[in-house]
């Protein structure tokens, strides 16, 4: 499988995307002299700083998110990893979705050796009508030493047949989230499912 390293994929307001059989890591991204990691992108001809890297970020344009959404995305049989807890301030999520994105499936993926795995909704205000309809199935989380397996704000998620091993937090259900879990296995995971943080 191809390995994408030192690259952060940002899918903004796109539709009908399939990513299969790839490996993604931000491990080893250089740090600037200030000691901070900065990722730079080009938007509308201008250079902008986009912050700490996600392996993949899926989002709608936040200015027009109510009408200009992204969706119909399938990510299948991929591997996501970074540097583990020792580098937790250097990397953000492995697979993050924010703003008004809809109709996504994440299947048969392997997430491992990282601090924060998957974020769905960047904050309590990131809850749109009918947003983030997600099927999340047959994924393997191994040694996620922090959180976000996933952290879900808003949206409707069917979370089934996933396996979590040696993780800190499991599925964190928060504001406006509708969640249905079945057939998942949590091995040596301290908080498999929680909804006590504003869910």
Predicted regions and their residues:
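Acidic, glycine- and Ser/Thr-rich low-complexity intrinsically disordered tracts
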Residues: 189-199
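Extended hydrophobic-aromatic, low-complexity segments
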Residues: 171-172, 194
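Short, T/G/N/S-enriched strand-turn elements that build extracellular solenoid repeat scaffolds
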Residues: 7-13
